[in-house]
Amino acid sequence: MLALDSSRQQQTSYFQDVHMDPALVDPFGFQMDNLGGFGQTSGPTSAPTSYYGTSPVYADSQLEPKTSAFPPMPPTPPSLPVPYSTEPYMSGLSSASGPSIASASSSAIGSPYSCTAHTFPESWVDTNHGIGLPAAVMDEFFPNEFMGSSLEADHTYQRKGPDDFVEHSNFSANCGFFLQSPDQSHLPVAENYSADHLSQTGLAVSSPMPNSGPHSRSVSIYDRRSSISSTNSRRSQLSPAASVADFDEESKEKGRCPHPDCGRVFKDLKAHMLTHQSERPEKCPIVTCEYHVKGFARKYDKNRHTLTHYKGTMVCGFCPGSGSPAEKSFNRADVFKRHLTSVHGVEQTPPNCRKRSPGASSVKKVSDYCQDATGKCSTCSATFSNAQDFYEHLDDCVLRVVQQVEPSEVINQQRLAEVDCDEEVKKTMEKHKLLDAAGDVDDEPEEDDDDYNELNLQLRSSKGAFKSNKANSSLGSRPIMGNHNAVTKNGKARATISKRRNNRDRYPPSWGCPSSSMKTKKRVLCVFDGQRRLWKDEMMLDNEFEVRLKLPGGAGDGTNREAYITDLDVETLKRAEGVLSANEDEKGPWLEGPATHFMGQPAKMLPALSHTHEDVDIDDLMS
């Protein structure tokens, strides 16, 4: 293999007798007779002490005879420019020759070692003979079993299969030869290739100084096709899927809550951080609500909760039958808003953002919905041309009504305060372990949709199931009297049926109440004189015969909200007024005990009853 002379000044250059003539242009016209003299002298004993401190690493006797006849030729031009080549600098080389045959700067063939050309064509494949021609052409002149220069510390190109030379691992670890770093001042430096640029483009800048430690064989790259273009290929771009994945990971880390006890990921991290405040600034305007004390972190959540306190009927002015018994009515604002979104195509406006530009729903007119659509707000009697404008108006309108203090609410507060201060009530509460403690209430209102009339089984807290109890912790251990005085212990909150008004015509078929027969309304009339009940009766009327009457004074709560009453209610009140407005002669004397006859003069004479406690058969009387 490669051996060095006694001094660097006595080294023989690659081109001793060959001059730069046009014959180099034609690879097949190249004179191969003098190639034996191109190599360096093979005297290993004449190497200077600065290069070898021990016996030579490679011996010529370890190679096959046919390989020893040829000098070591540089392999395919390396991927690095000349300034970063792993070949040691030799003073005998001229600046025109370069470290390889094809790198002559004055030749007609363009050299791939030129500093201005940083990419190599595909024709520069691994040929093992350094000329840059395919192995099929140069196979008759150069054997393919050639091993690279011993000074290539990186082992860039390796043969596939068993090698015919001794591996590095067979030598001792203290082979201890050191190469002197080449003087970079003699070599041309590329302007655009710095160490930083090479590190960014993925090209490793390797020092020509091999490691003095144990040599390990590098991994062979012959498992795939190797080429200069693949070695010097630029850094591949990330695929769109990988870019999206990296972006998602980056956005997920940005949205992660920094609170040590939380650590969850939120889209709106700024809004979530408000929930970690010690005090929630937004309070519910209803004094009796426990969120008047707890509060909310965001105004949007407070307004959404306040809408649940609305007590009234909201009529959709964009559905058919508005103003008639067939109108679509709601008793909850959130359910009404879902109806506008799902049925009338209203676009929801996200919180803390601007209103959207007018769309198709904002251009529609009232007549486009249905023939009898009014577009009227049942709360404030305002008229709107489309459902989108009414949807944006609904929150402010309902919140204004809810936040108004009703006169009856003031009276209720006074009465409740008197009960809270009563000592007897406190003793009773303590006796039954009903402490005045606020229970946990979910921030989200329960899902309720009048479009689907179903019986929802929900696990509610004891405060929701039993409104008279103010704590749910004590119910878990309280014994409950069941049927036939059987004592059972309630360990968990019992499942209660949340029944809405529109569910009253959806009873199970086994009850014998088909929905077709559920068309009547029942009015129960109870007339009292102080604590004495004077009258109680029931009246049934089919919905088809019910007539709605508009109250002239409205709802009477200080707003312009319209209110309605049926003709049956009017007739029922007339009967009550007839009883209460009767004089003493018309009422007659008050009889203690159960009554044996109807009030007033009967239309039919009653049979004589021997005993006052006997029951009266109503069917016999009415027959």
From Swiss-Prot:
Recorded phenotype for the gene knockout or disruption: Leads to decreased hyphal growth, azole susceptibility, and attenuated animal virulence. Results in the marked up-regulation of a series of drug efflux pump-encoding genes, especially atrF, which contributes to azole drug resistance.
Classification via SMART domains: ZnF_C2H2
Gene Ontology MF terms: zinc ion binding
Compartments where found: Nucleus
InterPro entries with a match to the protein in the record: Zinc_finger_trans_reg, Znf_C2H2_sf, Znf_C2H2_type
Compositionally biased region (Low complexity): 227-239
Keywords: Metal-binding, Nucleus, Transcription, Transcription regulation, Zinc, Zinc-finger
Gene Ontology BP term (one): regulation of transcription by RNA polymerase II
Biased composition (Polar residues): 202-219
Zinc finger annotations (C2H2-type) as residue ranges: 255-276
Residues annotated as signal peptide: none
Function summary: Transcription factor involved in fungal growth and virulence potential. Negatively regulates antifungal drug susceptibility via transcriptional inhibition of the expressions of drug efflux pumps in a crzA-dependent way. Under the treatment of azoles, both zfpA and crzA transfer to nuclei and coregulate the expression of multidrug transporters and then keep normal drug susceptibility in fungal cells.
Entry protein name: C2H2-type transcription factor zfpA
